[in-house]
């Protein structure tokens, strides 16, 4: 199987991404007995002119990660969101795919606790992204796009970690 490579384009569809975010937000907020406190559209699809892979990133704030029960996971599965099992610390990640054969992500939910450090890191990261979008675009352009999506995501994470540690 050939590894997926990130396909990046300049975001000139911010309004379309915002509409899709609003649709997903409505679904999330109306889930029965939802533990969700608030949501926020984050990442490059929320910023005009950002170089983006087109994945809509949504920050989902809950009282506690323990509030995300098996029942909530099943409800998210019914909306075609599937939990990504990675060694994430203090967050859960769910993805929605364009299809389940290629596993091309179209939406990613980043679920964090209301009073946790992760929430502040995401909010600070979004502010940095908005302020330094040209530098981030240059960084993305400079990456070797023969790398896999996983390697690409790791490089993006490294950029944010460097910026957050300053």
Residue ranges of model-derived segments:
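Catalytic core of pol beta-like nucleotidyltransferases
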Residues: 1-53, 62-70, 77-166
């Amino acid at each position: 199987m050939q590894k997926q490579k990130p396909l990046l384009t300049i975001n000139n569809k911010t309004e379309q991404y915002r509409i899709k975010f609003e649709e997903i937000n409505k679904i999330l907020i109306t889930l029965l007995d939802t533990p969700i406190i608030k949501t926020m559209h984050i990442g490059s699809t929320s910023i005009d002119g950002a170089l983006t892979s087109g994945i809509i990133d949504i920050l989902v704030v809950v009282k506690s990660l323990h509030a995300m029960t098996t029942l909530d996971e099943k409800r998210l599965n019914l909306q075609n969101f599937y939990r990504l099992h990675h060694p994430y610390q203090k967050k859960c990640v769910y993805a929605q795919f364009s299809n389940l054969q290629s596993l091309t992500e179209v939406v990613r939910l980043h679920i964090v606790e209301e009073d946790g450090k992760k929430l502040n890191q995401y909010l600070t990261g979004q502010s940095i992204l908005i302020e330094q979008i040209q530098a981030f675009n240059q960084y993305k352009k400079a990456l070797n796009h023969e790398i896999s999506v996983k390697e690409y995501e790791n490089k993006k994470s490294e950029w944010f970690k460097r910026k957050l540690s300053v």
